[in-house]
Design a protein with these regions (language model features):
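Helix-turn-helix DNA-binding module
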Residues: 5, 125-136, 140-161
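DNA-recognition helix of helix-turn-helix
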Residues: 70, 149, 155-179
Length: 182
């Protein structure tokens, strides 16, 4: 590959793929459970994405990048972790940034913020207890906002499986939170 096409690929990659870097980081954070591992996963995933960028026709850059990051996360976790242990240390910060982009904070009082933090903490703990396949589907749908078809594309399972995993994940969350409230 000559220098001109390499620069063109870089510019095209930056335009099409890099806008979804925050989504990739959020997914990696939920799958890995901590900032350090998520950064490693996203870095490796972006390198893989760039290396394969010219070889594919990409109709949905977001789903394409998330698929690569997901696969990188599974490979990375398989090499670097001996168990299914998920540590949660800084996902609250990531989720707060996501929430700040989506919502307004006009009528937030210290009391409602404290309640929301406690509720968010319970929800986060319940999500981390979900089996990885359920957690992944839930994060892709409810945090990343992907539709069923896109989730099926990212996870390489049928749409029916995505729907089933989401349903079961939500049932388990409701059950876990209800049990915690008692």
């Amino acid at each position: 590959m000559d220098r001109v096409s390499s620069d063109g690929d870089r510019a095209r990659f930056e335009t099409l793929v890099l806008p979804y870097l925050a989504d990739a980081y959020t997914l990696a954070g939920w799958l890995a459970g901590n900032r350090s591992d998520a950064e490693d996963i996203v870095q490796e995933g972006c390198l893989r994405a760039f290396q394969g960028f010219g070889a594919f026709t990409i109709s949905n850059p977001r789903a394409w990048l998330l698929t690569i990051v997901r696969n990188t996360a599974y490979s990375w976790l398989g090499k670097n972790r001996s168990s299914d242990l998920v540590l949660v240390d800084d996902l609250v910060a990531v989720e707060q940034k996501q929430a700040a982009r989506c919502g307004n904070r006009g009528s937030v009082t210290p009391e409602t913020e404290l309640i929301a933090k406690a509720d968010a903490s319970k929800l986060q703990a319940a999500i981390t207890e979900l089996p990885l396949a359920f957690r992944e589907a839930l994060v892709l749908r409810d945090v990343q906002g992907l539709d069923y078809r896109e989730i099926a594309e990212v996870t390489r399972v049928p749409v029916g499986t995505v729907m089933s995993r989401l349903s079961r994940a939500r049932q388990k969350l409701v059950s876990a939170i209800a049990t915690d409230e008692r």
